[in-house]
């Protein structure tokens, strides 16, 4: 139904195809938080059960008659609960997933707003700017960081062109996704998030180190040149995120720099070491595009946040009706 509606809208020129915006919204799944598990939650439950079993065993040593039978039943009940949690733990280990939902297996616990979490699906949506009409959506159980590339590919197929500009918020600011946009020859403007770690003095934040593409060097605010040995290093970003390749930049001038403690929290140990990822040039190009198209980017909210404002707040559709996985959830959203 949704695809047919988009085709009709295109036929009547209701879709402009020159400017689109992408965003996501969380829709609650038919799975309670109680029936969602990760390793930490399992560890807490198992530790509690082990403690209770130990208490029961201590009582069992002095119990007799009906009291003994009652305690043995309690131990059996706790043992069965432990086996259940161990089975879920094995599922987590075998699948490599961070969490398991037992009512709707493909739903995941996610942050919805202000650090409030819900077991939900994350619906990626592409909206055309001409009349704020959604042209595409995809029901996922992941966050936004790796979503933009695929949604741009789909938009290119739907619009049958790559001559459009796409607007996204900072949740989509990922180097590998910027590369996909570049490879598709699509102009994407993605908001730039705040730097995760700052220098003790903001004057020495990495944004104030000037990169020279010709020499592949950085110049620090004190005028010193940071260079690389040319080697690429795999940076570990955690169990559930792929490694990224980086080059490291440093200078021996750090040893005698009087501003060192203003520049780096670990200056006395290492001096200042900058890292530049394999995707840095795509992030740099995005920064230039965003800064030179500020008025255009301001349209993002009015384009993409309006449809779900209507759907969720006025129509009350904030949850998935079925608990049969992403495919059935996708049908719910499409209708």
Spans of features found by a protein language model:
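Anion-binding and metal-coordination hotspots
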Residues: 1-335
């Amino acid at each position: 139904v949704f695809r047919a509606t988009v085709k009709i809208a295109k036929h009547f020129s209701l879709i402009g195809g020159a400017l689109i915006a992408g965003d996501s919204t969380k829709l609650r799944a038919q799975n309670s938080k109680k029936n969602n598990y990760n390793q930490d939650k399992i560890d807490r439950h198992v530790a509690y059960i082990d403690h209770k079993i130990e208490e029961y065993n201590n009582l069992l040593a002095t119990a007799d008659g009906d009291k003994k039978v009652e305690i043995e039943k309690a131990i059996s009940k706790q043992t069965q609960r432990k086996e259940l949690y161990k089975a879920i733990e094995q599922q987590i280990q075998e699948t490599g997933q961070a969490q398991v939902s037992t009512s709707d297996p493909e739903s995941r616990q996610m942050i919805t707003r202000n650090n409030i979490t819900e077991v939900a699906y994350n619906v990626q949506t592409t909206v055309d700017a001409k009349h704020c009409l959604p042209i595409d959506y995809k029901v996922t159980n992941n966050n936004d960081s790796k979503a933009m590339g695929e949604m741009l590919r789909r938009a290119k197929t739907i619009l049958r062109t790559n001559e459009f500009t796409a607007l996204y918020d900072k949740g989509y600011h990922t180097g590998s996704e910027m590369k996909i946009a570049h490879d598709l020859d699509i102009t994407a403007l993605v908001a730039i998030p705040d730097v995760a770690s700052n220098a003790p003095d903001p004057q020495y934040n990495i944004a104030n180190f000037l990169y020279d593409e010709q020499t592949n060097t950085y110049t620090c605010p004190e005028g010193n040149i940071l260079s690389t040995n040319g080697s690429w290093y795999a940076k570990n970003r955690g169990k559930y995120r792929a490694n990224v390749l980086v080059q490291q930049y440093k200078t021996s001038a750090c040893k005698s720099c009087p501003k060192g403690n203003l520049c780096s929290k670990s200056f006395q140990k290492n001096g200042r070491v900058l890292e530049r990822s394999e995707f840095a040039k795509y992030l740099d190009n995005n920064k230039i595009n965003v800064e030179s198209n500020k008025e255009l980017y301001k349209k993002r909210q009015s384009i993409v946040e309006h449809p779900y404002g209507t759907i969720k707040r006025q129509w009350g559709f904030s949850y998935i009706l079925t608990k049969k996985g992403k495919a059935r959830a996708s049908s719910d959203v499409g209708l």
